[in-house]
């Protein structure tokens, strides 16, 4: 893998025969050819008739992609520069609040891919940035339409010294606009001018694009889906403000390097595709229903939640890319928590439950802050890493005991991604690895991994409830909740 990472699948239930079969499957399914079509600008999102260009936000793997006379690589780079220039002006004090004072906090208002990915990346690098003197501004996030979410965040910040990023591609997202109004109301009550505290990340055709209510607008387009948008202005604005544009650029560099590895037709030299194919084998041949993502790094505490959206929204489909029902299982359930916390939570089921759940561990040799203590001849970081090694062997080998309550059958497959330290570059490579894994699995299953119709029905019904246009079961549940 890129950026000093390594993918180890020694504890997976695959041998040379299986690997050869998976290599044949990769060729038969034309996985690399389909990836080439994607990054060269083919319409891969067949449902919405759109290209899929998140790779282009970090590097150009193939041909120039031009839409309506606009080179999309140049467009993405221009928006990254716009975000970088804005962040630098905030950091130097060229852009200030009404009293000429520097902003110290940035709050992102968004939901789904506008929250999960950027939040996960911010948390992942917060300690690294502090240790490396690149921490510029504290970042917070408002996502849920639950008013307690916004109220709690606003109560925790100094409004006069806070910037707010409103993220909505369409400019019409109900939850985001509701929370924006919540924030504006708080700013006005504090005697502040909202337009001096807010910027937008949106599309060029959105109502937010040219509004005077914002200090600036950073643009995205229809070709980068929300769950893949951390490398666009959706992640770029807040991460550049929090850590500096140079750190965000390092994330992109790590992702770009991993993307280049993903173009290799040899599955043993393409960790993203190999991981994907082993996952397909576990899902469709072995029949395993879920995958647990287990980072032994507190900095990656929200990374499983981001991958949960990225994977399940992409490949949680029961029809193929032509709209026809499939007669095989597709995407697994994804869940996870950081270790060692998870060991004292759901690992019991993973070790001794009736379902076998494949495991994806992530571990680093060094901590980010470098602050540690030696107790009983080992540091905390050594104890953390020892637990990873122990769990992999325990899951794979188990332990026989005549007392069945203490018997561990083993045979629980796992992989591990290891690195020296979690840095911006290795974080970018890690992000790209899982994005590419999901993409390759979607190709094998012949899915459109880049739409999310499953999100829409609930939105439509919720609007009916709020308009009091209900009957039947919808009315019963509306009345139950006193709407």
Q: PLM features: residue spans?
A:
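Extended, charge-enriched "interface" segments that sit outside catalytic cores
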Residues: 1-99, 376-385, 396-397, 419, ...
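Electropositive phosphate-/nucleotide-binding environments in soluble metabolic enzymes
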Residues: 12, 16, 73, 77-84, ...
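Short glycine-rich or small-residue beta-strand-to-loop segments that form or flank ligand, phosphate
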Residues: 104-112, 164-170, 290-297, 334, ...
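Short, solvent-exposed amphipathic alpha-helical segments in soluble enzyme
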Residues: 121-126, 155-159, 181-183, 215, ...
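Active-site phosphate/pyrophosphate-binding segments
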Residues: 186-371, 410, 457-483
């Amino acid at each position: 893998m890129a950026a000093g990472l390594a993918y180890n699948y020694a504890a997976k239930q695959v041998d040379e025969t299986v690997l050869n079969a998976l290599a044949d499957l990769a060729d038969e399914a034309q996985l690399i050819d389909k990836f080439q079509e994607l990054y060269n600008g083919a319409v891969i999102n067949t449902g919405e008739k759109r290209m899929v260009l998140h790779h282009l936000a970090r590097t150009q793997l193939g041909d120039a992609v031009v839409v309506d006379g606009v080179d999309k690589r140049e467009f993405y780079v221009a928006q990254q520069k716009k975000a970088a220039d804005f962040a630098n002006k905030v950091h130097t004090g060229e852009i200030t609040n009404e009293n000429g004072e520097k902003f110290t906090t940035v709050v992102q208002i968004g939901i789904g891919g506008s929250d999960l990915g950027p939040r996960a990346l911010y948390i992942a690098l917060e300690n690294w940035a502090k240790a490396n003197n690149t921490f510029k501004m504290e970042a917070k996030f408002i996502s849920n339409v639950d008013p307690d979410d916004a109220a709690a965040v606003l109560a925790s910040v100094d409004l006069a010294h806070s910037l707010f990023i409103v993220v909505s591609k369409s400019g019409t997202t109900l939850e985001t606009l509701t929370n924006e109004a919540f924030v504006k109301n708080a700013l006005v009550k504090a005697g502040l001018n909202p337009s001096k505290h807010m910027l937008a990340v949106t599309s060029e055709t959105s109502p937010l694009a040219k509004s005077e209510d914002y200090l600036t607008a950073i643009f995205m387009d229809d070709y980068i889906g929300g769950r893949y948008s951390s490398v666009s202005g959706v992640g770029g604005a807040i991460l550049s403000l929090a850590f500096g544009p140079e750190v965000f650029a390092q994330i992109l560099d790590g992702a770009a390097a991993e993307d280049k590895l993903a173009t290799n037709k040899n599955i043993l030299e393409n960790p993203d595709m190999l991981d994907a194919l082993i996952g397909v084998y576990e899902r469709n041949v072995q029949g395993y229903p879920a995958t647990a993502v287990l980072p032994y790094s507190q900095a990656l505490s929200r990374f499983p939640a981001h991958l949960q959206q990225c994977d399940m929204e992409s490949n949680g489909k029961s029809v193929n890319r032509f709209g026809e029902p499939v007669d095989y299982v597709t995407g697994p359930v994804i869940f996870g928590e950081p270790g060692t916390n998870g060991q004292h939570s759901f690992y019991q089921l993973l070790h001794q439950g009736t379902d076998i759940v494949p495991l994806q561990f992530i571990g680093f040799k060094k901590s980010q802050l470098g602050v540690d203590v030696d107790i009983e001849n080992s540091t905390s970081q050594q104890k953390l890493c020892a637990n990873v090694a122990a769990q992999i062997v325990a899951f794979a080998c188990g332990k026989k005991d005549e007392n069945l309550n203490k018997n561990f059958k083993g045979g629980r497959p796992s992989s591990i991604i290891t690195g020296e330290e979690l840095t911006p570059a290795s974080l970018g490579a890690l992000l790209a690895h899982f994005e590419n894994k999901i993409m390759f699995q979607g190709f094998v299953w012949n899915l459109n991994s880049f739409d999310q119709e499953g999100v829409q029905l609930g939105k439509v019904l919720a609007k009916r409830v709020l308009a009091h246009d209900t009957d039947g079961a919808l009315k019963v549940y509306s009345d139950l909740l006193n709407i």
